[in-house]
Curated annotation (Swiss-Prot):
Protein name: S-adenosylmethionine synthase
Residues noted as binding Mg(2+) in the record, renumbered to the chain: 18
Gene: metK
PROSITE patterns in UniProt: ADOMET_SYNTHASE_1, ADOMET_SYNTHASE_2
GO terms for biological process, alphabetical: one-carbon metabolic process; S-adenosylmethionine biosynthetic process
Length: 391
C-alpha cells in the first residue's frame, strides 16, 4: 500500500444540473414516503433550458396528486435558487411521466406469507470509511464538499451578491505516510453574475474564493498561488440547466467517496429504500464507519451483493487494506449477527422508511451528521457491540 502520493476528489454544488435533478428526484421520494412509508418510487429527472421532466415508476397506498408533485418540484428548484431567464422555478415547463410500478417487479420483491421481502434488483454495493477525517471520509472529498457548502451558505445568506447556484470544486492533497498534509492544487468553477465580467470582477472572485479556501482548509495547507485555479476557462455566467442538461444519477462518485473506494454503479437518488442500490450502500457505509470507529481498522471497504427477489445477500466482503487489528474473515462472520442484511432488515434497523432523502442529494450521502431522522447510516451505535465481539 502506497504511503506517499497525490490524490484528488471533486464535488459539485446543489445548483449543478445533475444535482438539481437528484434533488428533484429525492423530493418526489420524500413526498411519497410522507404519505405511505411502504411506497415504491423510482423517479428519474431531466432538467434543461426552461424544462423539467420527471418519469419513472411508483406505487403507493395513498394517492399523490399531479398538483402536489408539480408544487414539490418547483419548490425544490426555488430553494436551490434558480430565478434565471434560462431556468426559473416559476415559469419552467414541467412534464410528469410517472406511472405504476411493473407487476412483474412487485411479485418478486414484495413480502408474502411464505417469504421475506426480496431485493429490488441484483447488484453490488460498497461501503467505505477511513480515519483521516473526523467524519471518517477521504479528506479530498471532505474538503471539496465543505468548500462548496461555504459558497452556498454565503449565497443563501446574501453575504455576497455575485454568486449563482452552479459550481464545481476539486481538491488535490499531498499524502505523506498515508496522511494528508497539505493541498497541492485547488480548482473551483462557479457561476457568477454579469457584475464580475470585467478583469477587476474576476480578480474580486478569485480573492473571495481564496478566502474561502483559507477558512475551510487546515492552517498551512494552502498551495502555491499558481496552483489555485478559479474559473480557469474565464467567464461563467450561463450555467445550471440552461448551460448543461442535468440527469438523475450522474454524480455517483461525488455522492459517495470521491474515487477513494469502489462503486457498484447504482445511483441513489430517486429510489425508495427497498432498492438495494440505495439501502445496501447505506448499510455498507454504516458498518464500515462503525468498524473504523471501533478501532478494528484505520480504513475499510465492504462489498455486498444481491439478487432480485432474494432477501439475503449473496456475499459479504471486508477489506481492511492492511490496517486491521482483527481478522477480516472474523469481521465478515460477526456483522450479520449484529444486523440483518436483508432489504427489510436494513430498512428496519436504520429506519429508512421516512421522508429523509432530499438533504442527501447534494454535498454527499456520506460523512454527514446524523441528526434526528436524517442520515441514520452515519450513527456510531454499533461501536460497543463490535468492540465486545472482539474483546
Amino acid at each position: 500500500m502506497r504511503s506517499n502520493y497525490l490524490f484528488t476528489s471533486e464535488s459539485v454544488s446543489e445548483g449543478h444540473p445533475d444535482k438539481v435533478a437528484d434533488q428533484i428526484s429525492d423530493a418526489i421520494v420524500d413526498l411519497y414516503l410522507s404519505r405511505d412509508p411502504e411506497a415504491r418510487v423510482a423517479c428519474e429527472t431531466l432538467v434543461t433550458t426552461q424544462r423539467i421532466i420527471i418519469g419513472g415508476e411508483v406505487r403507493s397506498a395513498v394517492p399523490v396528486s399531479e398538483e402536489e408533485i408539480e408544487k414539490t418540484v418547483r419548490e425544490t428548484v426555488r430553494e436551490i435558487g434558480y430565478e434565471q431567464t434560462g431556468f426559473d422555478w416559476r415559469t419552467a415547463e414541467f412534464a410528469n411521466h410517472l406511472h405504476a410500478q411493473s407487476a412483474d417487479i412487485a411479485q418478486g420483491v414484495d413480502a408474502g406469507e411464505d417469504k421475506d421481502e426480496g431485493a429490488g434488483d441484483q447488484g453490488i454495493m460498497f461501503g467505505f470509511a477511513t480515519d483521516e477525517t473526523p467524519d471518517y471520509m477521504p479528506a479530498t472529498l471532505y474538503y471539496a464538499h465543505r468548500i462548496l457548502e461555504r459558497l452556498a451558505e454565503d449565497r443563501h445568506q446574501k453575504k455576497v451578491d455575485f454568486l449563482e447556484p452552479d459550481a464545481k470544486s476539486q481538491v488535490t492533497l499531498v499524502y505523506e505516510n498515508g496522511v494528508p498534509v497539505r493541498a497541492s492544487a485547488l480548482v473551483l468553477s462557479t457561476q457568477h453574475s454579469p457584475a464580475l465580467s470585467s478583469k477587476e470582477g474576476q480578480a474580486k472572485l478569485r480573492d473571495y474564493v481564496k478566502s474561502v479556501y483559507e477558512d475551510v482548509l487546515p492552517k498551512g495547507w494552502m498551495p502555491d498561488d499558481k496552483a489555485i485555479f478559479v474559473n480557469p476557462t474565464g467567464l461563467f455566467e450561463i450555467g445550471g440547466p440552461d448551460g448543461d442538461a442535468g440527469l438523475t444519477g450522474r454524480k455517483i462518485i461525488v455522492d459517495t467517496y470521491g474515487g477513494a473506494a469502489p462503486h457498484g454503479g447504482g445511483a441513489f437518488s430517486g429510489k425508495d429504500p427497498t432498492k438495494v442500490d440505495r439501502s445496501a450502500a447505506y448499510v455498507a457505509r454504516y458498518l464500515a464507519k462503525n468498524i473504523v470507529a471501533a478501532g478494528l481498522a484505520k480504513k475499510v471497504t465492504i462489498q455486498l451483493s444481491y439478487a432480485i427477489g432474494v432477501s439475503e445477500p449473496l456475499s459479504l466482503y471486508v477489506d481492511t487494506h492492511g490496517t486491521g487489528t482483527v481478522d477480516e474473515a472474523k469481521i465478515e462472520e460477526v456483522l450479520p449477527k449484529l444486523i440483518r442484511l436483508t432489504p427489510k432488515g436494513i430498512r428496519t434497523h436504520l429506519k429508512l422508511n421516512k421522508p429523509i432523502y432530499k438533504p442527501s442529494a447534494a454535498y454527499g450521502h456520506f460523512g454527514r451528521k446524523a441528526d434526528g431522522d436524517f442520515f441514520p447510516w452515519e450513527k456510531l451505535d454499533l461501536v460497543d457491540k463490535l468492540k465486545a465481539a472482539f474483546a
